[in-house]
Amino acid sequence: MMKSIQPIIELMGELRNFTLFWCGQSLSEIGTRLTGFGLSIWVYQNTHTVTQLSLMIFFTTLPGVLITPFVGALVDRQQRKSIVMMSDIAAALITLTLAALLITNNLQLWHTYISAFLTSVCGSFQMIAKSAALPMMVPKEQIGRANGLMNFSTAVGQLCAPILAGILIVIVQLQGLLLIDFSTYVIGVFTLLFIQIPQPESDKRRSTGVFGIIDDIIFGWERISSRIYLLILLGFMTIYFFVYGLTDVLINPLILSFASIKTYGSIMSLAGCGMVCGSIFMSIWGGSQKSILPLFIFSALNGVGLVIAGIKPSIPIISVGVLISFFTLPVILSTNNTIWQTSVEPQVQGRVISLLNTVTGLGVAIGNLSASPLADGILEPMLNSDGLLADTVGRIIETGQGRGIGFLLVIEGLLIFSISLSLYYYFRQLGEEILVTGSEIVVLEKINTIEE
């Protein structure tokens, strides 16, 4: 056991800056998730409508996605440590304001929308600045492990925040959760005071003003489009996140179509454990330093997990599928991040990563919006006992409530599996691992040769 976690211990021991940064920001992230969970409970308890809750979630996600390209351009212009610190401080002040409004009995529903919007903006700055700062703090050969640790924090937050929030909101109420979140921000900012985040060389072609920022965004896109393997990867990850957006909406009604709420909670706890284990695995393994191929291996496994989860209305079968899918998720995300962070010059990473996040974020949003029309409007009626597919597909995956959703998960899984397998063999034909080549010309020449 000690031998297996030795790489993580060595990484954290050698890289003091990254360790302090990771600890402070991880604590801050958990605090943010506590507040998000607590506010969602407050909104629902005070409105008793899903619509108002959906609006709050909308203001939490979409604004951040839409402004991300501009955030990336600004991140490349400023000190990344300062951006993380200022966004932490801004988010802390938003949380403190909410706590003050709640304590004085002045908190209104529209306050939560505004706070969700502003927190989303702060989160965009934090996410892009942290992604761009990580390669500056960690040697190239350790970036995979560092990304694994960052995803470990996310997984722990997703697993523990609902449980902790459910306990704490009874003891200290929502205002207590908000003050705990504020404290985690303070700790996060405090740790930043003791670390150094190296700044890359400035971009000599930088212009000023609004048009300068737009020009920076265009330049970031040119850095992506000039490398065919990055364009292919961007397209693949957009499809993957579209499927993720579908699954995120469908997993709840799929399980509840034949199981209890308690069973649903148990399966999702298993999913959280899978994410934690996947993050630990990635932190120990560190990923392949010279190959894009492991990304497609684990995404193919992710597709297999989705097929298993959708194939039968069985708790053990769905549990296995969910476990496989969520175990591979942090490995896929960490590997994807590592590819981008090692393939793009440090001084343009803010712009490039922000464009990646914008496109994939839109993929998630489209997946969220498409889930209901595809499942309820098309596939669920087809897999009723007298539906169009009852005597064909229904013989395999069964018919009735939730089977249209299950069939959609099977389709998603087969889609991801087939694309992953195709790209695996496509890149394998190159005859050379291309992740950290340091030369786009070599990669492009090899791809062009194959296509001819």
Mark where each language-model region is:
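Helix-loop junctions on the cytosolic side of multi-pass membrane transporters
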Residues: 105, 132, 136-137, 178-209, ...
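Pair of pore-lining "gating" transmembrane helices in MFS-fold secondary transporters
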Residues: 9-41, 117, 222-246, 323
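Juxtamembrane intracellular "pre-TM" segments in multi-pass secondary transporters
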Residues: 2-18, 198-235, 443-447, 451-452
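Glycine/proline-centered helix-kink
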Residues: 37, 155-166, 279, 364-372
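Transmembrane alpha-helical cores of Major Facilitator Superfamily
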Residues: 26, 58-62, 89, 148-152, ...
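Helix-loop-helix hairpin linking two adjacent transmembrane segments in secondary transporters
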Residues: 104-107, 154-192
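C-terminal transmembrane bundle of multi-pass solute transporters/carriers
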Residues: 54-56, 66-70, 77, 83, ...
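Cytoplasmic helix-loop-helix junction between adjacent transmembrane helices
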Residues: 115-158, 162
